[in-house]
Amino acid sequence: MSSFKDLKKNRMSNLESLSKQVEKLIEKPTYGDDRIWKCERDKSGNGYAVIRFLPAGQNEDVPWVQMWSHGFKGPGGWYIENSLTTLGKDDPVSKANTALWNSGIESDKNIARDRKRKLSYYSNILVLEDSANAENEGKVFLFRYGKKIFEKITGVMNPEFKDETPMNPFDFWEGANFKIKIRQVDGY
């Protein structure tokens, strides 16, 4: 049990501790994940990086994870959550969207369109070149990407034409570097 003498002696350290707690409350929360790498843009809106997709980890079948998510603004604020359909389960938002879509009412269909789930893929990558953040070079990160990049990956694995040789872009030794080029065009 603390005595008054101890309380008086420790009052400044208690003040410091309380001040730190107040600072934590005032700080705006960050929702970013330091494990996920993003190609940063320069002041003109352009970005460039070279990455290497890494093979699947031990006990993993494929070197990517497919993730469905919802992100929309409703009457009570923003709803940003991963969809349960990622786990093969029924998702309440997807069920509600289906009901809205099947109503046949165009305004309901528009709501369902705004709330539809979005597909992302995640893979481990090695950053070989990062023009905006050189300190990332040589480090391993998670990389979140969409359908278009996934189609490029599957395109080299299963080429469309006979004269193209299939390649595993996730092969550590014989894979390929992947160049990311982001260009600002007409304000977009």
Q: What is the role of each PLM region?
A:
Residues 2-169:
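OB-fold ssDNA-binding interfaces and closely related basic DNA-contact patches used
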Residues 181-188:
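Short, charged beta-turn/beta-strand-edge "cap" motif at the junction between a beta-strand
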